[in-house]
């Protein structure tokens, strides 16, 4: 099977289903990205508006991101084109940011937490693309408002409902359809309701890889969002927000195939299901011209379950109730103050009957058939609280100082933390800004690592230090550029332990240089033709390493890609047509090679002998995506995409036979065509 980013058992084992799916029919699955967009003039706006109180941030317009070629109209899929973001496989857009893992990130949508942001391993996001107004990413030393993460903070802003009339949208693509209805309900009330369902499972019932002996049902996903907004005046707003997402995939491993021969216990039917549902009431009140507050009270339920052949079943249900509040005060001359806090209570319900290999990213030899069988069915309550304070101080017209502090308490781990965040900005001219930031961050261990019976309740959090220095400049004609140098270290990664199940026993480092060159529409310039060409080019040079404390062994991080380059261009040719391209390339991802055999397992299977952890690399990756948008009428438009236009045979990994004597290459997406239609109502 291909290398996988996620190694925690309750995360990794369900991901086998996604691996099987992408090995068999990657073109069909990748088309789940599709969502149409119009053909208006396109620029990709990269600013720091949402995280302007800290360096190391990027903000992008959702409408513009939706037209990045290869994203299928989904703004969130386009984030992989940003500097510092690594993805190891075409089948997933889940981002590994600046040397951290995808599950080291935290996600918020309009001040509210969400269960997950991407369907079925990252093929498409869980929010209607027509609702996404802005996307922001903080990748180092971010504001103390955000915690419980050492990777990055993703903050999505949805637009409010229209208030002029009842209207909507219909979106159709090769893989699914979504519908949006919105409008006013009187003078002070407005609403939107959106729903989406994939339909490639209705077109192709199943697929099979005969050599691997795996047949599967194509994955099914749904999502929905709803908002009821009450705005009695310009200073006071109350909204009710709801969102849901579901994902399901099923497959069967047949006896006699390669997959069953390598690990017999996976033989039989398997499935994975995940879902979340969240609802919240949010009050936003501008108490004066200098003081504002927003408060959110909400609840979220997450369900994750899977069955893996004869290896067993697992179910995890999490019910979270939270209260968040954020104050903003600008009445103190030269200061922008932000302060608030969060109370969170989480009920974790775990039922497990499974051969449980305690695999982490530090264990290449993960065999399910020989793993111990574990049973548990119990609940646990986790309570967390935090307070934070930040000040953006305009020292003079050129200098800005930023200081913040986050205090948090975790009753589950019985630990307290104080995390300072510091920043400095210097603008010698109106268009040139130097910035620097430093922050301490922490993240609790994964639930399966700290849950008793299967984990270690005494695990300490992962801790990280972030430092970043950057410079940005705006130039004439719509040109701008930005560069950042960053360094991160991570301490307290969990490793398997035969007595404690897990212990804190590994650390990591990440350093890099990022460069972004961007072209926007020039003020007063043409809006069509070659003079309206916009886009950006990004380059990341980085190094990410992991170290096992007990042995001192060092090796590259799973998503270590020393060179990442991306070019995105958009050309609004006329009122009806616009064109775009995206070319991306990166160093091959590291993997742990099989260098021979090492006897047999107790059941007689050949036992592989692995080389050094991540000691070899896949071939370099590169791909070209093309896009054309066509507006037929004011309300009807379409897009057409050619993915992997020159049919580069990028390598996803390698598959071995049961004797580990023959290796086959597993390829990523071939060339394929996709399209989508949009009708405004």
What do the PLM-derived regions correspond to, one by one?
Residues 173-197, 212-250, 271-293, 331-337, ...:
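Transmembrane beta-barrel wall of Gram-negative outer-membrane proteins
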Residues 533, 585-605, 621-623, 629-681:
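C-terminal beta-signal and adjacent terminal beta-strands/loops
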Residues 394-400, 487-489, 504-593:
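Gram-negative outer-membrane beta-barrel transporters
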Residues 243, 330-336, 342, 376-488, ...:
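Structural signature of Gram-negative outer-membrane beta-barrels, strongest in the C-terminal barrel
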Residues 303, 349-367, 426, 430-468, ...:
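Surface-exposed extracellular loop regions of Gram-negative outer-membrane beta-barrel proteins
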Residues 47-143, 153, 157-160, 514, ...:
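Periplasmic N-terminal accessory/gating domains of Gram-negative outer-membrane beta-barrel systems
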Residues 217, 237-286, 297, 301-320, ...:
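Flexible loop and strand-edge segments within Gram-negative outer membrane beta-barrel domains
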Residues 294-298, 304, 427, 434-435, ...:
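Membrane-embedded beta-barrel scaffold of Gram-negative outer-membrane proteins
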């Amino acid at each position: 099977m291909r290398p996988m980013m996620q190694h925690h058992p309750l995360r990794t084992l369900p991901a086998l289903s996604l691996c099987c799916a992408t090995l068999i029919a990657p073109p069909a699955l990748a088309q789940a990205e599709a969502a149409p967009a119009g053909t208006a003039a396109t620029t990709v706006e990269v600013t720091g508006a949402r995280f302007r109180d800290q360096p190391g941030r990027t903000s992008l317009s959702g409408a513009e991101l939706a037209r990045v070629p290869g994203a299928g109209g989904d703004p969130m899929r386009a984030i992989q084109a940003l500097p510092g973001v690594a993805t190891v496989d075409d089948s997933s857009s889940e981002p590994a940011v600046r040397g951290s893992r995808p599950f080291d990130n935290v996600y918020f949508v309009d001040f509210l937490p969400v269960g997950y942001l991407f369907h079925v391993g990252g093929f498409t996001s869980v929010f209607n693309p027509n609702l996404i107004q802005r996307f922001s990413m903080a990748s180092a030393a971010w504001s103390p408002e955000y915690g419980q993460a050492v990777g990055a903070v993703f903050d999505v802003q949805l637009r409010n409902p229209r208030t002029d009339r009842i209207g909507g949208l219909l979106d159709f693509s090769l893989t699914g359809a979504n519908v949006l209805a919105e409008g006013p309900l009187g003078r002070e009330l407005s609403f939107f309701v959106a729903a989406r369902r994939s339909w490639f499972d209705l077109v192709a019932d199943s697929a099979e890889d005969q050599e691997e002996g795996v047949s599967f049902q194509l994955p099914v996903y749904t999502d929905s969002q709803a908002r009821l907004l009450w705005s009695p005046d310009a200073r006071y707003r109350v909204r009710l927000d709801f969102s849901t997402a579901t994902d399901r995939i099923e497959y069967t491993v047949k006896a006699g195939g390669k997959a069953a021969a390598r690990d017999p216990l996976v033989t039989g039917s398997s499935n994975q299901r995940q879902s979340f549902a969240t609802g919240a009431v949010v009050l936003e009140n501008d108490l004066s011209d200098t003081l504002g507050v927003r408060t959110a009270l909400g609840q979220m339920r997450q369900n994750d379950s899977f069955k893996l052949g004869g290896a067993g079943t697992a179910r995890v249900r999490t019910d979270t109730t939270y209260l968040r509040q954020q104050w903003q005060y600008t009445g103190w001359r030269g200061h922008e103050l932000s302060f608030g806090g969060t109370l969170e209570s989480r009920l974790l319900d775990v039922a497990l009957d499974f051969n449980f290999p305690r695999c982490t990213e530090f264990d290449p030899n993960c065999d399910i058939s020989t793993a111990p069988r574990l049973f548990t069915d119990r609940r646990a309550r986790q309570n967390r609280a935090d307070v934070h304070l930040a000040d953006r101080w305009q020292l003079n017209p050129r200098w800005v100082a930023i200081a913040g502090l986050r205090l948090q308490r975790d009753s589950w781990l019985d630990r307290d933390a104080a995390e300072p965040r510091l920043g400095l900005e210097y603008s010698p001219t109106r268009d040139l800004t130097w910035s620097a930031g430093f922050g301490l961050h922490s993240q609790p261990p994964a639930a399966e690592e700290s849950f008793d019976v299967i984990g270690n309740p005494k695990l300490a959090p992962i801790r990280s230090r972030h430092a970043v220095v950057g410079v940005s400049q705006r130039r004439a004609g719509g040109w701008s550029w930005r560069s950042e140098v960053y360094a991160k270290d991570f301490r307290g990664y969990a490793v398997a332990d035969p007595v404690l199940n897990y212990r804190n026993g590994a650390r990591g480092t990440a350093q890099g240089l990022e460069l972004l060159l961007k072209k926007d529409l020039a003020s007063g310039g043409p809006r069509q033709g070659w003079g309206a060409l916009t886009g950006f080019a990004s380059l990341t040079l980085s190094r990410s390493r992991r170290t096992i404390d007990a042995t001192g062994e060092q090796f590259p991080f799973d998503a270590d890609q020393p060179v990442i380059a991306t070019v995105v261009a958009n050309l609004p040719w006329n009122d009806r047509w616009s064109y775009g391209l995206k070319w991306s390339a990166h160093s091959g991802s590291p993997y742990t090679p099989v260098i021979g055999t090492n006897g047999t397992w107790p059941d007689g299977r050949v036992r592989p002998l692995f080389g050094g952890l991540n000691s070899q690399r896949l071939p370099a990756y590169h791909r070209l995506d093309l896009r054309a948008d066509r507006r037929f009428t004011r309300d009807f438009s379409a897009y057409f995409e050619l993915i992997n236009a020159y049919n580069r045979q990028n390598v996803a990994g390698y598959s071995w036979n049961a004797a580990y004597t023959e290796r086959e290459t597993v390829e990523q997406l071939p060339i394929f065509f996709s399209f989508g239609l949009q009708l405004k109502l």
